[in-house]
Amino acid sequence: MAKKVVDIKKTRIKISAFLFLTAIFALIVRLGYIQIVAGPTYSQEAMKQQYKDTVIYPMRGIIYDRTGKELAVSVPKNDLWIEPDNIKDSEKDAAIETLSKILELDKEEIKKSLSSGKKRFALAKNIDSDKVKKIREAKISGIWFEQSSRRYYPYGKFASHVIGHVSNENVGLAGVEASFNTYLKGIPGREIFIKDARNREISTNSLSYNEPVNGRNLILTIDEVIQHHMERAMEQALVDNNAKRVIAIAMDPQTGDILGMVSKPDYDPNDSRTPLYPLFQEKIDAALSDEEKLKELYTMWRNPAVNDIYEPGSPFKVVTASAALEEGLVYPEEWFNDIGYTEVAGRKIKNLTSKPFGSITFTKAVEQSVNSTFIQIAQRLGAQKFTEYITAFGFGKPTGIALPGEGVGMQYTVSKMGPVELATTSFGQGISVTPIQMISAISAVANDGKLMKPRIVKEVTDENGEIVESFEPEVVKRAVSKTTADQMLAIMESVVANGSGSATKIDGYRIGGKTGTAQKVIDGKYQSGYYISSCAAVAPIEDPQVALLVIVDEPKGASYSGSTISGPVVRQIMQDILRYLGVKPNAQAVIENNDSKIVIPEIRNRKYSEVAIELEKLGIGHVLDAQQEIDTSGIVIDSFPKPGDKVPQGSSVMLYIGSSTDETIIMPDLSGKTVKEVTELLKNMGIEFTPVGSGKAVKQMPSAGTMVKKGNMASVEFE
């Protein structure tokens, strides 16, 4: 019996030893697995709890105008995040008190957020650096800052279709922000530091720090002053004509540089999802889904000057005429006979006016925009030659401008261009082009016949201002010879001097131009009452420095012709540009009717009551803009005609009145004024300034004509 008990005990000991050894073996195997197989994984998890890995976002590159003015900048952005579970109960009240005081937030709101049950949330965004420093010094547990940057556009909706905007993630969505996103975005960096259980940084020294690489900067060809002049004129044209939209492009014909590009209605890139005009607001409100809403937003963001096509009408006659002149198929003083229409393949194609011109020279036919004459010269060219010249002037293919979504346009191939198509294309009907193609073709005539690639970005620079990449002016091809281009310019000058372009005349300057009135195609048919009014111009003829195209889409009023709708707008913009560029009036052009005219004095930035009295003394009347809510105690912010223009005695000047509280004013021309005179003038305007030297003003910044905000600083040099 005793032996049996001993055997049982031995068996139990053996079993216990076996189980113990098995457990030890299993533990060793498990430890081996953890150490060898799962070790890296657990090590990473442990490191995650000990270390904090933070992405450091780069600053997106700055976008400048051609003179160095900042059009798009990145502002540092600090967002404060909180993990409520990592704040000790004993520290919670003190943390709420500190955050409320520094961030100027309501204590109860902070308490409510902390008890919301969220694991983490952003308590405040876009915190300035001083507040960030104070919060860091408070060493509050359970909080951290996420650092990035936000995009800011100092001029608001200024050139919004050209500049574009970015997403919340700082990715370019439109304009050069999109097409040059790779240059602008930069490369993110990383920072790793040790943290405690409450998510607080233990050491001020990073274990690892990879510095971000900031984005490259862009220098555009756009000139801020020219763009502002164009924006103002086109906004007025949109309102005055109750138009669907308006477009304007100013180009340096010798380089292809885009000096200004305006499309309205536009939007504010600082708040890109909020429409500024009823047209877009109504469509977005009517959208039934997020997808439809986004589609309407993209429509608002697209740039019609580059993306959209239209039938150009009579400005296209410049291409037809240039082709015929180049081929020697017509000469300026050749006579044609007009009976008011032309029959082509059994179809009667009429002129814009039903009255026949009878015997008329080619130059006069261009002046009066006689369709029948252009049909005849297109027939002389034939479909093959005509399409070759259309292509030579850059139509039917992208211009290559560095903006997203460029349109191509539509034109007939030789096989598709029958007699009727040949006839209608000759005067710009039945062919679709983009505005950027049209202004490029006009510029080719102003550039000795050479077609330039439109340039919107001049250079890419690093953050030190060193040039990384340059985009030089590029000749695409020669469209016509210099001789032909000179002939065409002379004819275009005659159009302004004697023909349909007379509304673009500027006293003292030689201007060439061509107006157009094109009926719109809607649902596949030309619709009565729907027109595109346009005008293209070049100045000065003796040395072309500016080519300008203005388009008014669907003007609603007594007139819809390009000569009465777009011509005056071209005149206003061209006059502003030429003066800003310092182009002096041509002596020969100044002589005409000088003695019988009165020079409008500088009346901008002066009280309306004073201006009215001064104009009356000069024998000039005035009218106020009916579109404005007039404040007769306000300031004259602009006029039409402009100061410096000559007007007949007894004529009237349109005055644009702004409230004395308006923030934006026009920088006056200070040249020749004394320190005392400048001090008094700028003080009344609310502009501070620093005088340099003594005597009379010889140089100023900002330059005359620039739009500035009250309170801005000006610098004036005196000699």
Predicted feature locations:
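Short, flexible turn/loop "capping" segments at secondary-structure junctions
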Residues: 72-75, 114, 155, 209-213, ...
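Ligand-recognition elements built from short beta-strands and adjacent flexible loops
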Residues: 471, 505-508, 522, 529, ...
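Residues at or immediately flanking beta-strands
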Residues: 144, 217, 245-247, 335, ...
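Beta-lactam-recognizing serine transpeptidase/beta-lactamase-like catalytic domain environment
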Residues: 72, 196-201, 205, 254-315, ...
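Periplasmic/cell-envelope proteins involved in peptidoglycan metabolism and beta-lactam response
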Residues: 1-282, 304, 309, 384-394, ...
